[in-house]
UniProtKB/Swiss-Prot annotation:
BBIP10 interacts genetically with BBS1. Keywords: Cell projection, Cilium, Cytoplasm. One of its GO terms (biological process) is Kupffer's vesicle development. PANTHER family: BBSOME-INTERACTING PROTEIN 1. Belongs to the BBIP10 family. The lineage of its organism: Eukaryota, Metazoa, Chordata, Craniata, Vertebrata. This is BBSome-interacting protein 1. One of its GO terms (cellular component) is BBSome. It is found in: Cell projection, Cilium; Cytoplasm. It comes from the Eukaryota. InterPro entries: BBIP10 (IPR028233). It comes from Danio rerio (Zebrafish).
Length: 72
């Protein structure tokens, strides 16, 4: 691979300390998968669905009863 010439020439000191500036770089982390629905929300939805099913069954039971039993 051919080296690219830059307009700045590297200078290393013969004596003294050599310091280098640390440049922060981006570090890509593994993505975290988050659930679309929380466990609590799923439990609440299940409870609501069960309650609606019970109400629907009770309404069907009332419709199937003969009229004489409804009057009591």
């Amino acid at each position: 691979m051919p080296e690219v010439k830059s307009m700045f020439r590297e200078v290393l000191p013969k004596q003294g300390q050599l310091s280098m500036e640390d440049v922060p770089t981006m570090v890509l982390c593994k993505p975290k998968l988050l659930p679309l629905k929380s466990v609590t929300l799923e439990k609440l939805e299940k409870m609501q669905k069960d309650a609606q099913e019970i109400i629907r069954q009770q309404e069907l039971a009332l419709k199937e009863q003969p009229p004489s039993e409804k009057a009591e």
